[in-house]
Amino acid sequence: WLVTGYPWYGIQTPEHQAFLKAYQERFKDYPRQGSIIGYSAIMSLAAGIKKAQSTDTEKLITAFSGLTLSSPVGPITYRAQDHQSTMGSYVGRTKNEGGKGVMVDFRYMDGAKFLPTDAQVQQWRAKD
């Protein structure tokens, strides 16, 4: 089966390995997809506050326009036009290994490649 998910056991980037080690030391368990999404969301907020030097809503909106930060799955950018995150997803196949379902033959699909273009967003907004 073709699936999306979070193959924590097979991501070998230094950023992910650091996240995985810290997570397992703290929680004595492996991270789930919600773990990586939550971590990336909090790191995004921290980067936005640091850039804005404030928690004021308008300053954060400005700070998030084009904000790029590192994450365990690679860089994430918040598009200037609509503040959509480019965080992607892992896509692969399922396989039974030792009685457990695992994701194999996976690759990271950068969300930036799948978001609507700026022109499309402008067109949709014009209809609202």
Where are each of the predicted segments found?
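Extracytosolic ligand-binding ectodomains
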Residues: 1-128
